UniProtKB/Swiss-Prot annotation:
<feature type="disulfide bond">
    <location>
        <begin position="14"/>
        <end position="26"/>
    </location>
</feature>
<dbReference type="GO" id="GO:0005576">
    <property type="term" value="C:extracellular region"/>
</dbReference>
<keyword id="KW-0960">Knottin</keyword>
<dbReference type="InterPro" id="IPR012324">
    <property type="entry name" value="Cyclotide_moebius_CS"/>
</dbReference>
<keyword id="KW-0964">Secreted</keyword>
<comment type="function">
    <text>Probably participates in a plant defense mechanism.</text>
</comment>
<protein>
    <recommendedName>
        <fullName>Cyclotide cter-N</fullName>
    </recommendedName>
</protein>
<keyword id="KW-0558">Oxidation</keyword>
<comment type="similarity">
    <text>Belongs to the cyclotide family. Moebius subfamily.</text>
</comment>
<dbReference type="InterPro" id="IPR036146">
    <property type="entry name" value="Cyclotide_sf"/>
</dbReference>
<feature type="disulfide bond">
    <location>
        <begin position="5"/>
        <end position="19"/>
    </location>
</feature>
<keyword id="KW-1015">Disulfide bond</keyword>
<dbReference type="InterPro" id="IPR005535">
    <property type="entry name" value="Cyclotide"/>
</dbReference>
<keyword id="KW-0611">Plant defense</keyword>
<feature type="cross-link" description="Cyclopeptide (Gly-Asn)">
    <location>
        <begin position="1"/>
        <end position="29"/>
    </location>
</feature>
<feature type="disulfide bond">
    <location>
        <begin position="9"/>
        <end position="21"/>
    </location>
</feature>
<dbReference type="Pfam" id="PF03784">
    <property type="entry name" value="Cyclotide"/>
</dbReference>
Length: 29
């Protein structure tokens, strides 16, 4: 959805479910 997941990401990897890496942070889909 674009809400911040509370996680930064490196190499495009997010560990929070249903989140994707965007501009070095994880956003909910």
């Amino acid at each position: 959805g674009s809400a911040f997941c509370g996680e930064t990401c490196v190499l495009g990897t997010c560990y929070t479910p249903d989140c994707s890496c965007t501009a070095l942070v994880c956003l909910k889909n």
